[in-house]
A protein has these predicted regions:
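Extended, low-hydrophobicity segments enriched in charged/polar residues
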Residues: 112-122, 135
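N-terminal ordered "arm"
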Residues: 1-43, 195-235
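Short, surface-exposed beta-strand/loop "edge" segments at domain boundaries and coil↔beta transitions
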Residues: 11-15, 57-60, 179-181, 207-214, ...
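Structured domain cores in non-transmembrane regions
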Residues: 28-102, 224-296
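Extended, well-ordered protein cores
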Residues: 124-210, 214, 321, 325-373
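Elongated scaffolding segments in large macromolecular assemblies
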Residues: 103, 116, 290-304, 310-311
Length: 400
């Protein structure tokens, strides 16, 4: 999305750090450490001076040059802008110039409402302009009262009906848009659901009821990013945190097994890290495994996820015959011959498999376990490791 050179405004002799935004997840901690070397990049302060900025898709962001920003604000803005299509980026660029915005907070606020303006960059194509304008009004909830959509006539009504403001990106028509504060300067708003996100939560200090003081977190992520989110939310330790579930890519069986009133944020993150490479079939299989094993916490589910290859799953098989049919036709363990389909005894094979295995039918199909440990032993987490993780999550005296 963009690259920015960030420097310490008070100590420019320390040099600048060039950061790619949004910051790749595997380089986030490295980036924070690099900023710390020039004594910027703290969690709560706007201590990064934007010395330079380059963006092909969003040149209006250069208006932030020489302004102060927080590194996580810049990262949030980049993620938000990545979700915009080509015309939406044009709207954002033009609106930023139209309203004279230059601070990162103003840009963050604009990202929520820039879709409400209409931008005409080509007056030779009024048909397309009219269609765009009509769709824009649908976004604002104020569509024109008209019959069948006629693009050119709609564009002509727009041009004649309200003043346009010339920018380098085109002529901007406000459509009554008002810039409203969505960011309070501390608590980052909810952002676009990232492609790699498996679970989204809100975290707040114990007893806090003002939802504006909660932080949104998307898992999996780095531990340092979680710790910074805790600081923004005023959470000093894991024991003083409340978790609110927003959504996940996991199956209902997994979500229902988690008691978010008592879960550890870091254990949930470890679970999501363990499932980061899962495909849809893996999530479905894990749901079936959870129905069979009945885990009661994120740590147990993580153990199941990490040992998913010790389970066999026949999706949608709910009878011995369906199980036998799946194994012979779809499991790839046998060379199935379509010409002999009437000669296979699926029911007998399914019954035989049931008698030989430690398996059961669940809502999603048939699931069996072939590991050497009992399920209780498999799900048992290392108590010493859990204790160490909780100690590492203490926030007192943290530098960031």
């Amino acid at each position: 999305m963009f690259k920015a050179s960030l420097e310490n405004n008070n100590l420019p002799e320390l040099g600048a750090v060039t950061v790619e935004f949004p910051i790749p997840e595997d380089r986030y901690e490295e980036t924070i450490r690099a900023l710390e070397k020039i004594k910027i990049g703290t969690t709560l302060d706007k201590d990064c001076c934007v010395a330079d900025l380059r963006s092909t898709d969003c040149p209006a962001l250069r208006r932030m040059i020489n302004r102060m920003a927080n590194v996580d604000e810049l990262d949030w803005l980049a993620k938000q802008l990545e979700s915009l299509d080509r015309y939406e980026l044009l709207q954002f660029n033009a609106a930023a110039e139209r309203f004279g915005l230059s601070s990162v907070g103003e840009m963050m606020d604009l990202s929520f409402c820039s879709r409400e303006v209409t931008v005409i960059s080509d007056f030779n194509d009024l048909e397309n302009v009219g269609r765009r304008h009509h769709l824009t009004l649908l976004v604002t909830g104020t569509p024109e009262e008209q019959g069948p959509l006629v693009g050119t006539e709609t564009a002509q009504r727009l041009i004649a009906g309200q003043p346009g403001h010339v920018t380098q990106y085109g002529v901007v028509y406000d459509n009554g848009m008002k810039l409203k504060q969505a960011y309070d300067g501390k608590h980052l708003p909810q952002s676009w659901w990232a492609e790699n996100c498996l679970m989204e939560l809100e975290i707040g200090a114990q007893g806090e009821t003002d939802k504006k003081k909660f932080e949104w977190v998307q898992l999996p992520t780095s531990q340092i990013k979680l710790e910074r989110a805790m600081l923004r939310a005023g959470i000093s330790s894991c024991g003083e945190m409340q978790l609110l579930f927003s959504g996940s890519r996991f199956s209902d069986e997994v979500d229902c097994a988690l008691d978010f009133e008592y879960e550890s944020l870091f254990e949930l993150n470890h679970l999501c890290q363990a499932c980061a490479e899962f495909q849809d079939a893996d999530f479905e299989k894990l749901g079936a495994v959870c129905q069979m094993a009945k885990p009661v916490c994120a740590a147990s589910i993580r153990q199941l996820a990490e040992n998913l290859d010790q389970f066999d799953f026949a999706p949608d098989a709910h009878t011995p015959e369906e199980l036998g049919k799946y194994m012979i036709q779809r499991s790839r363990r046998y060379e199935y011959d379509e010409k002999l389909k009437d000669f296979y005894n699926y029911d007998d094979y399914g019954v035989k498999k049931l008698l030989q295995e430690d398996g059961t039918f669940v809502d999603r199909g048939y699931i069996s376990y072939r590991g050497t440990l009992t399920l209780e032993e498999l799900m048992r987490d290392d108590p010493a490791e859990s204790c160490q993780q909780e100690q590492e999550a203490k926030m007192e005296g943290m530098a960031w």
